[in-house]
Amino acid sequence: VSVSIFHIGLHLDHPTIPPEERPKIAKRLSELKEMMRSAGYNYEIVYASPESGLEDFRHQLKTQPCDGVLIGGGVVGNPDLSYFLEQIIDATHEAAPKAKILFHNHSVDVRTTVERWFKARSV
């Protein structure tokens, strides 16, 4: 069974993400997902925002295996989103109490962050 990671971040059209950065971020996320899956992880990217809420995220946590939740740098690195960060942590604790919570801050690559807690297991 592979390690299952949900990477939660802002919708790419969120006002805090500059429009000129959105294509680069989308490409980076797509490459990241492919790289993590190639490394043996079940890696899903989930989009949410304070405006859209966390109901879909909660539903995924309750209905799909989740070993860890990686909170993206757009949330972690923005002090204005600290309450949203707390809501993500709270939702994770409620719906997937055994899941590890990981923060991505762009100073360390995602795989390194994930492998602090998990080594990929073969499928």
Where are these regions (language model features)?
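N-terminal, charge-rich interaction modules
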Residues: 1-18
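Glycine- and acidic-residue-enriched helix-capping/strand-helix junction motifs
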Residues: 15-28
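Short, glycine/charged-enriched secondary-structure capping and boundary segments
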Residues: 20-23, 59, 83-86, 116-118
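Short helix-loop-beta junction
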Residues: 31-42
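Short beta->alpha junction loops
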Residues: 43-52, 104-107
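Mid-chain, well-packed structural core segment of small domains
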Residues: 55-93
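Ser/Thr/Gly-rich flexible loops in soluble cytosolic domains mediating phosphotransfer, phosphorylation
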Residues: 87-123
